[in-house]
Design a protein with these regions (language model features):
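Catalytic core of membrane glycerolipid acyltransferases/transacylases, capturing the structured
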Residues: 1-43
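Non-catalytic C-terminal accessory region of glycerolipid acyltransferases
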Residues: 46-172
Length: 172
């Protein structure tokens, strides 16, 4: 989903975008120049806050995945994001950047969801992340529905709710 979104946003905005992504994905050809890597298993480098600040202060459109992880399959078989983190709200307000919600309609393989469930229950790290490239190649040539919502002005995120509550509001 991230690669497809980057392609669409990149074409529409002349390549002026950056991803905030798991740093493991920086090993994929072509992603490193357009990404700011987040270390999800250890500590971020001392340069990380500076890189994030530079990204948000630039003319680049920042692509963030508010859940921080891929969607998970629930016991009833439905696929849902885990609760969204508040970071996109706090960064929106801090850097006075509007939020444009995007919904990517697609799903990963049953194998991916089984690995994710096992990893979530039994491992201290996200093993499923290691299989994302495989999932991407399984979907080459397939069509997906991408819905791009109306921009939400950063001023919307006022003190009437906490950043976490605003994140839940945008997700809903």
């Amino acid at each position: 989903d991230g690669v497809a979104l980057g392609s669409i946003i990149g074409q529409h905005y002349d390549g002026n975008f950056r991803y905030l992504v798991n740093d493991l994905l920086l090993n994929l050809p072509g992603l490193k120049p357009v990404s700011i890597g987040i270390n999800k298993t250890g500590r971020n480098s001392r340069d990380f806050p500076r890189m994030v600040e530079a990204g948000f202060q630039s003319k680049n459109h920042m692509l963030m995945f508010p859940a921080g992880l891929n969607s998970r399959k629930r016991d009833d078989g439905t696929i849902h994001d885990i609760p969204w983190k508040k970071t996109f709200i706090s960064k929106s307000v801090e850097y006075q950047r509007d939020v444009v919600p995007i919904h990517f309609g697609g799903q990963n393989s049953e194998r991916f969801y089984r690995i994710a469930r096992f990893s979530d229950k039994h491992l201290p790290f996200n093993l499923a992340m290691m299989f994302l490239v495989d999932e991407m190649y399984k979907n080459v040539g397939k069509h997906f529905r991408i819905a791009i919502g109306k921009p939400i002005p950063w001023q919307t995120f006022d003190k009437s709710k906490t950043a976490t509550e605003w994140a839940q509001y945008v997700e809903d």
